[in-house]
Every structure is written in structure tokens, then in C-alpha cells.
Amino acid sequence: MSGPRFGSGVALLVVDVQNDFAHPKGSLSVRGAEAVIEEINDLIRDARAAGSPVVYTQDWHPPSTPHFDKDGGIWPVHCVADSWGAQFHPKLVLEGPYVRKGVGGEDGYSGFTMRHPVADEPVSTGLHELLREHEVAHVVVVGLATDYCVKFTALEALELGLETTVVRSAIAAVDVESGDGERALAEMVEAGAVVA
């Protein structure tokens, strides 16, 4: 299957390629994550060469948040603001703006919106506004993890009316339960995404 086409109206979204997810010593390391970084870098270069914007998402949590198991959530502490784990993986090519998720303790997985920890209302990360500034109608989604942040970013992109492509060779899954990644891909396809 051929890869995505970049150009006018198309943006590449690089989801959460950070040390805590992508590095083997990360607190929530995703198996196979380092192996997809070069493919992601190739797509970044292709997008930039075609004049497409590249936008990164970055998990950026306070030390205490309902997202963490120590505070009642389900995940180990990860991507705490200004920590090594929150930094982008050193092998990732960085050529574009980024939006941060969870800065104020919000919970969720999408690169577009999170849930306010008290009001339980959506809080924008600024991603949709950034894409509108660039007149983006189609997003290509890559990064980590297939079954969480990639999936919810792709699903919300579709809800916002954006054509959405997910590049199979440039994602990796947490697979808390065996097969979660494949089920997430099927859910994205059912919602209207193209898997390339």
C-alpha cells in the first residue's frame, strides 16, 4: 500500500513521541516504539518537502493528576512537565509547532481536547485552531500509542470533519490487552479513517 500524499491542505500530526513512551527506559515504554521513529522521520521530511505543516503533540502533566495511578487513575506516572520522560525522543526530527496535553491536570488522550479535572468539560489544546490557520482538511496521524492517543486523536479529527489517514508503519500500541492495537485500528477504520 502506498504512503500518504502531502501538499496543500494536508498536515502531519506526530503524536507523543516522547521518552516515557518511546524510550526503552521510559515509565510507560511502548514495545516497538523506537523502531517506528525512522519511519516517522521519513514522513516528517516528506511532509515538509511538500509544504505540509507538521504538528507535534506532547503529553505534559503536573506531578499529581487524576490520570496517574497514584492519584486514582490507571497509568504510572509519566511525562511530568520538564522531566526527561516528557521530552521528545532524541532521535525524532523536530520541525514544527507542538501542542501540550494535560498541562492543567486535564485527563484524556486526544491531541485536540482533554477533560477538565473538576468541571469535566472539554479543554482545547489549540491543535484544531492551529490546523484551521493552515486551512488543513486532511490529517495524517502517526506516533504513540495506537490504542490510546493515536486512536483518540484520529477519532476526534474525524468528528471535526477532517479526512484522516493513519500510517500503520509509523505507530505502535501499548497493547494492555493483547490485540488492543488491532482493535483500535479497526475502530478508526469503522469511523472513517484510512489506514495506509
Region spans (language model):
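Active-site acidic carboxylates
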Residues: 1-105, 133, 137, 162-166, ...
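Aromatic/hydrophobic pocket-lining residues that form the small-molecule binding cavity
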Residues: 36, 40, 124, 150
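Histidine-anchored nucleotide/phosphate-binding helix
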Residues: 43-44, 150-161
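Short, surface-exposed loop/turn motifs that are enriched in glycine and acidic residues
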Residues: 77-82, 116-120, 143
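Hydrophobic, well-ordered secondary-structure segments
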Residues: 85, 89, 124, 128, ...
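Histidine/lysine/aspartate-rich catalytic loop segments that bind and position anionic ligands
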Residues: 93-130
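Hydrophobic, aromatic-enriched interface-forming segments
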Residues: 109, 118-120, 134-140, 153
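Glycine-rich anion-binding loop/nest that anchors nucleotide
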Residues: 136-152, 166-168
